[in-house]
């Protein structure tokens, strides 16, 4: 009997960061860079209230949350699109802009989801080598061809924790062709406190060929609710809305996210906690001669090759 056959999907499967935690070997799960303190108590309270009424569909465009985001960051509400996590925004970008034989440039050690969605939409992924685990603007520019369509940059980067300076990322956009879409992933920007760093939203909010994405999964502690968003020109956002699934973010998630973004005190508490403990861990690893990156985010990258040599 001949059965239905799926088309050839030229992409690797995303494997969630459960590692040894799922096997109950690890006591604390660290592999997904989730919030240390969890969600704001105000967000939890609003989520519980909203969870008592499931019979109504959510606002398909998430108008209330988009309005809250726009007010918080002084943005144009009509240029905001919500996703079921920022992952979905990346998926929509790839669906809307990529065709067969297009090329997408990603950094050598970048978030895997960029290349998964690029390949699923028939694009060729080009890997720009990194310098000491840091994305190189010159190397990225050297990878550009007449087929380049999108460049994905996480700044700061996951999983390395390194970043591209303000001047260098502006240089990247300036030297790219205007028809190449630059996507800047701001997932971890809130933790950064370095003079030569600036978030994508502040640098590119007025650009018509840049999409900046953000998430509620990290510093806001709402990873289980799946809420992310993108900010781009009206033309780009209109294209994404044409293919965005209806009701893609559930109502309790929308309401909890709106409460979370307003709770500045809780946000600052999380930032203080992360900065305090990342410095402590860095100093401990250094004392033990374990090589790691000095980071401005909520995770550390450890070189286990050096750890092995040290232990020997």
Regions found by a protein language model. Give the residues of each.
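Active-site pre-lysine segment of PLP-dependent enzymes
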Residues: 119, 137-146, 159-182, 186-219
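Short beta-strands and strand-loop turn motifs
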Residues: 127-128, 150-156, 182-186, 293-295
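Conserved PLP-binding catalytic core of the aspartate aminotransferase-like
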Residues: 285-312
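Phosphate-binding glycine-rich loop
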Residues: 63-103
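N-terminal "arm"/small-domain region of PLP-dependent enzymes with the aminotransferase-like
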Residues: 1-56, 68
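PLP-dependent aminotransferase-like
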Residues: 96-153
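PLP-dependent aminotransferase class I/II
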Residues: 209-285, 290-293
């Amino acid at each position: 009997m001949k059965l239905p056959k799926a088309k050839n999907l030229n992409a690797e499967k995303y494997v969630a960061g459960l590692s040894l935690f799922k096997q109950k070997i690890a006591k604390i799960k660290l592999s997904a860079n989730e919030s240390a303190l969890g969600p704001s108590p105000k967000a939890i309270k609003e989520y519980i209230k909203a969870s008592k009424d499931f019979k109504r569909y959510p606002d398909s465009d998430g108008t209330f949350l988009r309005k809250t985001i726009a007010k918080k960051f002084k943005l144009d509400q009509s240029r905001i699109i919500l996703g079921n996590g920022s992952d979905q925004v990346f998926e929509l970008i790839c669906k809307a802009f990529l065709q067969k034989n297009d090329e997408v440039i990603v950094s050598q050690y970048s978030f895997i989801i960029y290349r998964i969605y690029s390949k699923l939409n028939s694009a060729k992924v080009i890997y720009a080598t990194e310098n000491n685990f840091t994305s190189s603007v010159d190397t990225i520019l050297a990878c550009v061809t007449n087929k380049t369509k999108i460049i994905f940059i996480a700044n700061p980067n996951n999983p390395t924790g390194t970043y591209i300076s303000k001047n260098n990322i502006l240089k990247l956009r300036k030297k790219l062709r205007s028809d190449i879409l630059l996507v800047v992933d701001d997932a971890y920007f809130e933790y950064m406190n370095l003079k030569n760093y600036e978030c994508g939203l502040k640098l590119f909010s007025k650009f018509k060929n840049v999409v900046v994405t953000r998430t509620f999964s990290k510093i806001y502690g709402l990873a289980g609710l799946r809420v992310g968003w993108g900010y781009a020109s009206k033309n780009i956002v209109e294209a994404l809305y044409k293919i965005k699934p209806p009701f893609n973010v559930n109502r309790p998630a929308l309401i909890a996210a709106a409460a979370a973004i307003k709770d500045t005190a809780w946000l600052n508490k999380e930032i203080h906690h992360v900065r305090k403990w990342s410095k402590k861990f860095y100093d401990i690893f250094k004392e033990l001669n374990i090589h790691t990156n000095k980071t401005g985010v909520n995770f550390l990258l450890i070189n286990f090759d050096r750890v092995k040599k040290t232990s020997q």
